[in-house]
């Protein structure tokens, strides 16, 4: 997936500026994002878009898919405002801001001209840029990933209950959420289901290259 950091930054900020609810500090939020690595950070360390600009690209991908899902399942009219979709999609991964750092990773490069050999063939060692999670002392910690993202977002945008639930639980029932039972949460809050679906479609289908 080709990523244009500057174009994505412009689009992300343009969407965020459409949030106009009382109490929202959008200017402060944008300043926070621009003062961080949000627009240049990866979306993960290994699984999807683990490249510069991946986090912002993923957030926009989730937004686009979320809009499509809402239009698909609510053809007669969405129960959610455009503002709600913008907020939960763009902000669901705020926890990943300033979370990762670059390090040099040694990898095997296989070719017929390799000077070394293993069971897979000839290779040479090469150094590539990779990402890893910072130590807990060097990044924001509050709760699990979803809770961290909800807290950061709520600092700048007053969230309605369903928005908070959606951001907090967007990863679904993985290990970090145990011993929570996600079924009653998803049964009560459809926005949480839709955000979860959009996130997973983006991660495992659209960005799975």
Q: Across the structure, where does each feature detected by a protein language model lie?
A:
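Non-catalytic interface/linker regions that flank or bridge core catalytic/transmembrane domains
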Residues: 1-41, 45
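Generic alpha-helical structural signal
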Residues: 10-13, 27, 60, 64, ...
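A glycine-rich, hydrophobic loop/mini-helix early in the fold
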Residues: 30-81
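Polar/charged alpha-helical tracts
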Residues: 10, 14, 28-31, 71, ...
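Extended interaction regions within the primary functional domain
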Residues: 24-35, 70, 174, 184-187, ...
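Generic structural signal for well-ordered, non-membrane alpha-helical segments
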Residues: 5-9, 55, 59, 160
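Divalent metal-dependent catalytic cores for phosphoryl transfer on phosphate-bearing substrates
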Residues: 47-51, 57, 75-208
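Amphipathic alpha-helical segments within well-ordered protein domains
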Residues: 13, 17, 63, 67, ...
